[in-house]
Amino acid sequence: TAEVMSXVTAXFGXALXE
């Protein structure tokens, strides 16, 4: 679902920021 993708995307965003 879009909700799940949002959370996954957030996690990737933080990882990429690192």
Curated annotation (Swiss-Prot):
One of its GO terms (biological process) is sensory perception of smell. Antenna. Keywords: Olfaction, Sensory transduction, Transport. It comes from the Eukaryota. Homodimer. Present in the aqueous fluid surrounding olfactory sensory dendrites and are thought to aid in the capture and transport of hydrophobic odorants into and through this fluid. Belongs to the PBP/GOBP family. This is General odorant-binding protein. It comes from Hyalophora cecropia.
